[in-house]
Amino acid sequence: MGRPARYTRFTGLYDLISMEPIYRTGRRLGIGGLDLRPGDRVLDVGCGTGWNFPTLEQAIGEGGHIVGVDLSAQMLEQAARRIGRQGWGNVSLVRANAETLDRSNLKTSGVDAAPRAFDAVLFTYSLSLMTDWPRAWRQATALARDQARVTVVDMQLPQAGARWFAPVARLACALGGSDIMAHPWTVLERETADVKEWSLRGGHIQVRAGTLAPGKEERT
């Protein structure tokens, strides 16, 4: 079973078994690192069931727009229910493979696909799920405006005094489909400026936020 398949295997129980209390702080720090303003447009790549949406909504307000992208129809069904319960009218969901994401995917889902439309791009615990995560990074960031903020939140093996937890972390990531050795935040460190970084839970959770350099090629 491949990593994407493992990600969707327990979709119905995802919110219960995702250990969100452990990983919530990483999400919130990552979203804070985007420096969002009211009215901003945010691309949430690998949005899952929409755990990021409440915090994003607080930052961008009713005048902003969230576009959540996920490959799993089941995850998006749960995200849609979350949106309905909260009455958010400014969240769009797109079912797409992040590794081939482009404006045509957005248009097909009825999303305004103006060139370089996004003020921020967010990856929380999602890139390490993807087989070709560098390509997913390129596709998503190509949809953002110059000087957009980007955040990557992901996982590695616990470090130093927390190494005793490493076997448990490795097993949990394997069951969920994440490659704990991927370290996808390294691409953000190379390709953005003004990088902010945080390390949580004995180094298990890594958070990076940076500003995109101008002139990235857009893929249509």
Q: Residues of each region from the PLM?
A:
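Conserved class I S-adenosyl-L-methionine
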Residues: M1-D35, W51-T55, Q78, F165-L171
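Class I SAM-dependent methyltransferase SAM/SAH-binding core
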Residues: L43-V45, T49-L101
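A short SAM/SAH-binding and catalytic strip from SAM-dependent methyltransferases
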Residues: A120-D132
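C-terminal lobe and adjacent flexible extensions of AdoMet/dcAdoMet transferase-like proteins
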Residues: R208-T220
